[in-house]
């Protein structure tokens, strides 16, 4: 019932064999699953949704599908259609689709990798290095401006992917941490360091009839291989795009894409203003661009991180760098209503303050209701299913102890029933704990439900009720 009503198990013991051997990840796709995938792909293509990748993932019965890239609006719509189609096709093959980010405790959960890039209306890919220094300057310009957007709106990007369900997955050793940083790879990092450390005169020189000569290092074609190594980064550059890996598996990708697109749009407008200001002071255009890029490279350096995103050292370092390290879902949503976020959305014409406030009310309310439903389901399971079975087993043990005393001398009976006595005590201790905590959880919900502010109510559910779910599960 918990899996059916909430999308995840609220109780249950971890299986003896799950993903330890990695035999599912490296194994062949089962025949029935392959038939489901084939049927799904055909129906997706009939709807005009191009898909290509199919392979096993780490957790048992976990698989991956990858659509081919499209324009952002269309790709988001197609992603929602695929989710709906998956459910329908799965049922026709005798399967059930689980889109929850963490349906089973102890095995890997699910997520989406949003591959994001920029191109012109004439087909020029702005996130790909070129063959000339000028092409590479353009490439570096857009890379650095994207990093600036991620740096200045670090908390907002995290808020755009955060939810009650995705919170189970982020920060575990299967998903990016709940700190938004960007991995660039060794070669691209060296290029940015070269620009940062070189003066304008070193990078721009006169070259006879050619005009300006740029000393931008050649970026090799092997860039993709060198930038796809760090799987712990939530926002990694992978050759000709950034891969936003923190989006939840049941999420609408629009939330993350709206925040990212608006942030980059605002940053590009700021870049144009900064360059124009230098040109007005008499600086040549190329020199002005490089000067601003150098300034940006230094400014956004805190968001660049190529190390292990799972480590405790990174959490401490991220806090030192001033990155958003908040882990409370309701508090993370506050980033939408920060002055910088409101100014960004309004200046780009994406949303007004009122629209942002309304959306946040929905986010807080949804969070509260998700935890509320889980608490109700867990309370019902514990009181009406788990405890009755536990006490029934306890009664059998007690009966066994009494019969031991009837059959054997007191000392012998005590010796033989010692383990049963320990079990009887442990069951009593655990059932008392569960009963007390379920009752406490009910009372905590009553108190929280009286709070009028959706934000404060969500915080109460996060701080008080959500931890009880794990405590009850453990016992």
Label the model's feature ranges:
Residues 1-99, 108-112, 118-361:
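Glycine-rich, acidic/polar active-site loops that bind/position phosphate-bearing ligands
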Residues 103:
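Glycine-rich N-terminal segment of FAD-binding domains in flavoprotein oxidoreductases
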Residues 293-475:
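C-terminal amphipathic alpha-helical interaction region
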């Amino acid at each position: 019932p918990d899996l059916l009503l909430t999308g995840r198990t609220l109780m249950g013991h971890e299986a003896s064999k799950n993903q330890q051997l990695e035999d599912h990840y490296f194994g062949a796709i089962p025949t029935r699953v392959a038939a489901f995938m084939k049927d799904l792909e055909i129906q997706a293509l009939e709807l005009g949704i191009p898909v290509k990748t199919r392979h096993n993932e780490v957790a048992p019965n976990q698989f991956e599908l990858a659509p081919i890239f499209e324009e952002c609006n269309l790709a988001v719509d197609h992603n929602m259609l695929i989710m709906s189609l998956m459910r329908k096709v799965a049922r026709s093959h005798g399967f059930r689709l689980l889109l929850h980010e963490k349906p089973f405790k102890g095995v890997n959960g699910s997520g989406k990798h949003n591959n994001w890039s920029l191109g012109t209306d004439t087909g020029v890919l702005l996130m790909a290095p070129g063959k000339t220094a000028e092409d590479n300057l353009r490439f570096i310009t857009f890379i650095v401006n994207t990093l600036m957007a991620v740096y200045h709106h670090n908390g907002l990007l995290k808020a755009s992917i955060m939810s009650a369900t995705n919170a189970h997955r982020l920060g575990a050793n299967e998903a990016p941490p709940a700190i938004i940083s960007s991995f660039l790879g060794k070669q691209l990092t060296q290029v940015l360091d070269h620009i940062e450390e070189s003066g304008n005169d070193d990078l721009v020189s006169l070259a006879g009839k050619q005009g300006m000569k740029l000393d931008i290092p050649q970026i090799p074609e092997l860039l993709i291989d060198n930038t796809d190594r760090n799987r712990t980064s939530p926002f990694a550059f992978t050759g000709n795009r950034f891969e936003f890996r923190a989006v939840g598996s049941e999420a609408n990708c629009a939330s993350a894409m709206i925040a990212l697109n608006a942030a980059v749009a605002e940053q590009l407008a700021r870049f144009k203003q900064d360059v124009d200001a230098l040109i007005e002071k008499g600086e040549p255009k190329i020199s002005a661009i490089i000067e601003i890029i150098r300034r940006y490279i230094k400014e956004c350096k805190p968001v660049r991180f190529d190390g292990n995103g799972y480590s405790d050292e990174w959490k401490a370092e991220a806090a030192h760098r001033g990155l958003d390290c908040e882990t409370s879902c309701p508090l993370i949503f506050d980033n939408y209503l920060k002055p910088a976020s409101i100014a960004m959305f309004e200046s780009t014409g994406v949303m007004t303050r009122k629209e942002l406030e309304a959306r946040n009310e929905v986010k807080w309310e949804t969070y509260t209701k998700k935890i509320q439903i889980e608490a109700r389901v867990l309370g019902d399971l514990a009181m009406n299913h788990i405890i009755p079975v536990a006490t029934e087993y306890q009664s059998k043990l007690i009966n066994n102890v009494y019969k031991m005393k009837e059959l054997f001398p007191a000392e012998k009976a005590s010796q033989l029933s010692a383990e049963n006595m320990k079990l009887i005590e442990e069951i009593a201790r655990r059932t008392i704990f569960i009963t007390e905590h379920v009752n406490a959880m009910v009372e905590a919900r009553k108190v929280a439900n009286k709070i009028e502010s959706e934000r404060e109510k969500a915080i109460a559910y996060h701080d008080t009720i959500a931890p009880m779910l794990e405590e009850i599960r453990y016992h």
